[in-house]
Amino acid sequence: MVTTVADDMFTGDAISDPYSYYGKLRDEDPVHWNELYELWVVTGHDDLVWMTRHHELFSSEFWKRDQRSPYPAIDESDMGLYQFMREFFMDWFIQHDRPVHTDQRKVVHKWFNPNSMELWRPMVRSVIKDCLDEADASGHMDVMRDFATPLPLFVIAQMMGMPHYDRKFIRSMAEKLLFIGRGETDRMQPLTEAIKEFIEYLTPLVEEKAAKPVDENDLLSVLASGEKTGALTRDEVVADAILLLLAGHETTINLICNGTLAFTQHPEQWKILKEGRLEEPDAITRATEECLRYDPPVKSIQRVASVDAELGGKLIREGDRIRWFISSANRDPKKHDNPDTFDISRWPNTHVAFGSGIHHCLGATLARLEGQEAFKALAERYDNIKVETNEFEYQPSITFRSLKTLPVSLT
Amino acid sequence: MARKLQITVNHDLCVGNAMCETIAAKVFILNDDRQSEAKYPDADTEENILEAAENCPVSAIKVVDADTGETLFP
């Protein structure tokens, strides 16, 4: 079908308002062949869920199987770096299919289950208190810099036993790794620099943990135990440690920042949250799920067809690459009533912010916990959160929905 | 003799992560929508079933003592 949507996904409009761009695609051509990137773009809720639950048709081994040129294009001279990057990403456990994926995920799955995560709630509360106490002194904060970033970064670094003075380094490496979702032709440079520096940083730490008996209170030690059971190689342990550090905070940053912005733009919902007048599940739980639906931290994820398969009436050929969009699926009118309305009473809230199927986000419970505690603390502490800017600038990423800053006043 | 369990999976929550199927494959079967169903509640040990419930990432599995009604998980 012909669509009126241009294929460039990095225009200012597509970045600032993915809901219009991908929403239009979803309405006009929900399984769309993007000629510019030689890529299937899947934008509807039901197609997304069907695809993610049919992992035997749509492989997660993207970096191993994708044979086409990088999209968007990169500098010809960086093809060696591109290859280096691919080989690194192939070691991530999320870049595998069954049965390898299951064996590798099992090493850390239990760590992240809902009961295990509850144990971290007091620490999350204490970090939030410290951040907000500091903000109270001036009555202002940049939600991104002063709250949304330090909280999840502190928590994941603490879980993995990283020294506190390394948090700044971890964040600066993460910022370079985020070039993975961007469109600059020279993006391989910062990206591969970060991979190399991260490997150098983590290798001795992993070596140290692997030499000792497993410490069940230390996520890096638990991950390293996968080497002893044969589920992971040393290189895979190091690669997954980088993945956990990155994914363990980047996504939650966006949940807290985007969610806070949504509340400032919808004072009536902020009032409902503050008054807590909703039945079980409570207002905080519902609000967090609605933030995840309304302005989700992750916009899209990739797959590659492992066989010829039909999706939404289109024939997808073996080896074709696919990107599925959470942004548009979460606003699909076939799934959600008044999908463009921010409504924290919505329940059940069947959003796909964490994906679906066997690759459903490992850290979902941690993200939820941090989001719940962050929104709860804001609602308990402040009557008004006022945004001190009229311009909202987002990182030019196809993968993440990340504000650059969010300055607010607090009263 | 092992006590009889009543196991339910909430399909508003189940995302088809299939970790329950991985841990207790004789009990949990994925349906056509790839959501979990506790088809054979007697087919594995209580310990394995509780482990499967505990490792559901979205807390969709509820386990009850079928005779007394006591909630065993969550």
Q: What residue ranges belong to the model's regions?
A:
Chain A
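Cytochrome P450
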Residues: 1-411
